[in-house]
């Protein structure tokens, strides 16, 4: 293991990412506590599976703003199924800097993205993975990630447990220091 090249990119842009955080929240009118949610895997984009995920998210939409940069198939589901709430924000995809700026100061990230599991771990942001497994196990063993699946009751339980806990402060992962390319 020589490191993680994706973390090199994050480290190289970290100052811009952190600076972007307040700017992007202001631009998007995010004023309180919020979750960032990304769903893009075909297995999660069926109407049945999205219904389970959104039922879990809606339980928290009165207390938290829920920000979703949306995949086109996800937008279609949202439009077809009237998934509207004043605290659910459906966005067009954001730039890398703005997206990670938003992630860096979020209360929680829910995702099915492997890369985002790594980025949240490095940014020390709590992450719940909407899958039954991960190809990034280090994000669970040493990071801030927990794999929870997509069953509504499990999503509700894990969000409650995670936001109420002090948990999720990951450890510094060896070689995730922005110097992977030098070691290669």
Please report, for each region that a protein language model flagged, where it lies by residue.
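Nucleotide-activated sugar donor-binding and catalytic core shared by glycosyltransferases
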Residues: 1-66, 74-184
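Conserved C-terminal portion of the radical SAM core fold
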Residues: 71
């Amino acid at each position: 293991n020589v490191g993680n090249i994706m973390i090199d990119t994050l480290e190289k842009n970290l100052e811009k990412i952190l600076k972007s955080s307040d700017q992007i929240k202001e631009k998007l009118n995010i004023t309180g506590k919020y979750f960032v949610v990304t769903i893009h895997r075909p297995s999660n984009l069926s109407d049945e599976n999205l219904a389970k995920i959104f039922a879990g998210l809606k339980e928290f939409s009165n207390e938290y703003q829920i920000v979703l940069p949306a995949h086109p198939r996800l937008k279609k589901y949202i439009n077809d199924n009237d998934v509207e709430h004043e605290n659910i924000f459906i966005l067009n995809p954001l730039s890398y800097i703005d997206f990670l700026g938003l992630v860096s100061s979020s209360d929680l990230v829910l995702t099915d993205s492997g890369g985002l599991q790594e980025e949240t771990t490095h940014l020390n942001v709590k992450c719940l993975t909407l899958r039954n497994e991960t190809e990034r196990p280090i994000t669970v063993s040493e990071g801030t990630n927990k794999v929870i699946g997509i069953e509504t009751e499990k999503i509700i339980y894990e969000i409650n447990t995670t936001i109420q806990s002090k948990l999720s402060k990951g450890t510094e992962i060896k070689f995730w220091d922005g110097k992977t390319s030098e070691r290669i």
